[in-house]
Structures are given as C-alpha cells and as structure tokens.
C-alpha cells in the first residue's frame, strides 16, 4: 500500500501494475484490488512443480512490462525460472539486520536469542536464502521480549524505507 501510495503521489516515478500473492485469501489481495492493482493470487499446491507456477508468474510479469519486482511477505525461495528471467531486478525486504537471522521467523529467533538491536534489510534476491547483496539497512533498539512489538516497530520503518530504496534504485 505504501508503494502504491508513493507512486500515486509522484514520489516514485513508477506504477505498481501487478500484485503476485501465494496466499489467495490474504488481506493484501483485497487491498490491491481496492487500489486498482491487478492481482494474481495462487496456491502452489495447484501446480505440479515450482517451475510451472514460476513460468506463469514470468508470463504475467512480461505481459505487464514489469521492470522491478519488490517482494514483501513472499515466503517462498525464488526459483531458477524467475531468477533467469528477472535476476538483478528483484528486491526483498527482510525483518532483520542480515546476515543475522535469515529465513522465516527472523524476529522470533532474534527475540529468543536476546537481541537488543533489531533492524530491517532490503537486498537483491539471488539463489541464496536472504543472501543477496544488501542495498539498505536500518536498525532500531528494543529492550523487550515481545516479537509482535518488534514487528510493529519494524513495519513502520519498512513502509518508508522500501519507498526510499525503490526511489534510489529507479533513479
């Protein structure tokens, strides 16, 4: 939503043309539809292979003239079909200061470990798990043990940070 709003305000010289979501019932699908963004919501189990649904995604990206893919909450490892077609044009936002706490449940793992400095990382997507070249990072301190509070603070930072980073990439 923050990216669409920034595009609509002219803050980012781009247009969000497509939302791809691997959870058809996710609230983001309804939000995107309200904002007039085309949606492709799929369930991986409806496809025989990862390559099959990634080919469908590539077709949709190509037919919509997509130049940059911005992942958010996409909890799947990007596969070879998508990387071959769009490598170097896919970014991801992750709720930790990578390379620490890569993968799923990053915030929960960090809280369990006793971390006091949390953060957000935006990175290029490659064939590793959250291992692509880092584009931007922002840290924040939190001295509690509530993962939900860390997520809440992090999401406030993410919205502004992703917009700023996309602007820089597109310049």
Language-model regions, residue ranges each:
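N-terminal Rossmann-like dinucleotide-binding module
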Residues: 1-27
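Proline-centered loop/turn at the N-terminus of a beta-strand
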Residues: 15-18, 38, 67-68, 89
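Short acidic active-site motifs
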Residues: 27, 56-57, 77-78
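Donor/substrate-binding cores of folate-linked one-carbon enzymes
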Residues: 6, 22, 68, 72-171
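Glycine/small-residue-rich loop that forms an oxyanion/phosphate-binding "nest" at active or ligand-binding sites
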Residues: 41, 48-66
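Short beta->alpha connector loops at strand-helix junctions that form conserved
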Residues: 40-45, 93
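Amphipathic, non-transmembrane alpha-helical secondary structure
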Residues: 1-5, 55-62, 160-163, 167
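Short, conserved SAM-binding/catalytic segment
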Residues: 33-41
């Amino acid at each position: 939503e923050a990216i669409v709003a920034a595009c609509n305000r002219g803050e980012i010289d781009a247009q969000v043309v497509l939302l791809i979501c691997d959870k058809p019932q996710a609230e983001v699908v309804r939000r995107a539809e309200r904002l007039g963004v085309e949606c492709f919501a799929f369930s991986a189990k409806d496809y025989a292979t990862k390559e099959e649904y990634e080919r469908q995604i590539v077709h949709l990206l190509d037919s919509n003239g997509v130049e940059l893919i911005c992942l958010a909450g996409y909890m799947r490892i990007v596969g070879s079909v998508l990387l071959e077609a769009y490598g170097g044009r896919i970014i991801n936002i992750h709720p930790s200061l990578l390379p620490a706490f890569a993968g799923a449940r990053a915030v929960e793992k960090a809280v369990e470990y006793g971390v006091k400095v949390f953060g957000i990382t935006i990175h290029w997507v490659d064939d590793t798990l959250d291992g692509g070249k880092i584009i931007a990072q922002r840290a924040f301190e939190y001295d509690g043990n509530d993962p939900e509070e860390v997520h809440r603070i992090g999401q406030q930072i993410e919205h502004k940070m992703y917009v700023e980073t996309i602007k820089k990439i597109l310049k």
